[in-house]
Amino acid sequence: MPRTLDPELRRALAARIRYYNEMGIYDFYRRPVSEDAGEVAVPIAADEDEIAVSHHTSPGEEMSPRKAAVAAPIVEENIFEVIALKPEQSVSDPVKALKIIREDLGDCTRCVLHKQGRKQIVFGVGNPKAELMFVGEGPGADEDTQGEPFVGRAGQLLNNMIKAMGIEREQVYIANIVKCRPPGNRQPERDECATCSPFLMRQIAVVKPKVIVALGATAAKTLLAMNSSMMQLRGRFYDFKPAGVHSNDPNWDGCKLAVTYHPAFLLRDPRQKGEAWKDLQMVMKELGMKAPKATT
């Protein structure tokens, strides 16, 4: 039986969330539940056929069960819809909308990465109306220095992959799961991804791509909320909607998402480049693109 909040408590929570929204706070994070926390006992109603009231009967008279009253459904306000309302949703220009998200991100101190040596926040770059979006895991040293995703050796390989598709880097949008460089170029921790990814979801809702390519396991697992291997994740499309936000465009209700290897991995194991090209060809077919003819 699903639990429902007391209507008065629900209205109070909705009012509190609106209050935070008016202060410019739009993202909320769940506290981990203590293992010692006890379960709240929820009374379970008996089946109506079992509900009967004892009453005096004359000899030979049978007792008949009294039908249980059926409560009218309660129409409750969905407080989580309040959380989903973002300031950029009232702006039709995607450039301005992305700027609002960047300003909301600010000089972010929401997770430990801000005090572990980052130089700057690496937000995202590219065409704000792109049909194709690439999402990596996080900035490296070169990205941290230049403030733009995928500008180092892995970025050069990504540029070549994009050119092989017959388009230029400027035609796509590129971002990462986390926007601060993890120390030593380590993989982002799960809590860091959970803290930063709401801003990425908002970027996706503004750009409204037709296809997202998740580069590497961290990006794929975070976006899809799946803990599967790359072998299991690759080779197919997933229906994707950015969690926690809604697009202000009624004609956009999510996109396709494909998974391929991260360019940094391909630098370490060039034998997998052919597999990555298969993934990109699948994306090209979905977008109606044709590979450019080889020149001699």
Predicted regions and their residues:
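Charged, compositionally biased N-terminal leader segments and the immediate start
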Residues: 1-12
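A polyanion-binding, active-site-adjacent surface
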Residues: 11, 19, 26-31, 41-296
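Terminal amphipathic helices with adjacent charged low-complexity linkers/tails
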Residues: 35-38
